[in-house]
Amino acid sequence: MRESLLYGLTAAVVTTLWLRWVMRSEVQAAVERDPAAGSAWQVLFLYPSVSAVAFHRVAHVLHRSGLPGCRFLARLLSQGARAATGIEIHPGAKIGKGLFIDHGMGVVIGETTEIGNNVTLFQGVTLGGTGKEKGKRHPTVHDNAVIGAGAKVLGSITIGKNAQIGANAVVIREVPANSVVVGVPGRVVRQNGEKLRQE
């Protein structure tokens, strides 16, 4: 009894400290990238993306724990977060530090998605599958990428570092680092600061 109480208290303290650290990087990302952010306190309490990512961090730990019933609890937590924030993140998704989801409503992040550090997503973004794959079926988004409002990034593809994807683009092919992609289907129009000739 005494050991389980001590274990529970230790787990609670570690989880609290961990969430504070995690939320700090999300809050800082919002303050730095959103000109409308008044203060860190405003972001912490009023930005749904911070809440959604915090819920996800807990759900992800539960999802990966392998303990009986934890996957169900993880899905329950993620569905509660979706209802509260309008942002759907599967508990299996791997997310780095400093994710900023601006406005957030309608964002969907699939189970096998991997997101690097300091990525920005706008409202209505889908990081989803094509429905044709098994296993790794969602995108990998590398550090500092920006994905515009309404963009759909589908399949087990890679979005390179510092890539920018324009609003409403539909991306189903690899995106190189330091490039800009627009259109349906998405095409690279700029890479390493150079405008590309379209043929």
PLM segments and residue spans:
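Terminal amphipathic alpha-helical/low-complexity segments used for targeting or macromolecular assembly
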Residues: M1-A81, L196-E199
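Conserved phosphate- and dinucleotide-binding cores of soluble alpha/beta proteins
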Residues: K134-H138, L196
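Left-handed beta-helix
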Residues: A84-T85, H90-P91, G96-K97, D102-E111, ...
